[in-house]
Amino acid sequence: MDLIFSTATFHWIKDHDRLFRRLAQALKPQGRLVAQCGSKDNIARTRNAMEQVMGEGRFPKFFTGLEDPWNLAAAKTTKARLEAAGFGEVNTWLHEEPTEFDSMDELARFLKTVMLGHHLERLPESEREHFAAMVAARLAQRGELVVDYVRLNILAKREVAT
């Protein structure tokens, strides 16, 4: 394979060392990896709001033992993992990409459909809308209707021998 392209996927994969080894094995020598995923700082405010709401009122019992669904790595850590997997000419950098919403309802719908699935599946159906609305309200306390994306961009070339 000459090129592997990925967007918004790597942060869902728990074992990045294995992932990068497999990608290096799939590429021809000098093949390129171009990817973007969530970084260590991705949705930090949003995750904080989720954690606060999970710990309030009737919600804690539903989230006992919940594992974080994301593997959000730092640029430096990702670079080291890629190099260890057989990539050279590795370039990793962060890009802030805040996503703004026009209304609290729009933000809550986005959270419910895009970000909170792993959390909502633990809740009774009757609690899901309320949970998403509470997370949205917690985010809005700073006067902004924003999800704070910080993307990790990756460019790498497979070394001749892996």
Regions found by a protein language model. Name each.
Residues 67-162:
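Conserved Class I S-adenosyl-L-methionine
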Residues 5:
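A conserved beta-strand element that flanks and buttresses the S-adenosyl-L-methionine
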Residues 8-9:
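Short catalytic micro-motifs in class I SAM-dependent methyltransferases
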Residues 22-25, 158:
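A short helix-coil junction within the Rossmann-fold of NAD(P)-dependent oxidoreductases
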Residues 2:
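Conserved acidic residues
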Residues 17-18, 28-102:
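Conserved catalytic/acceptor-binding region of the Class I
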Residues 13-23:
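A short, conserved alpha-helix within the catalytic core of class I
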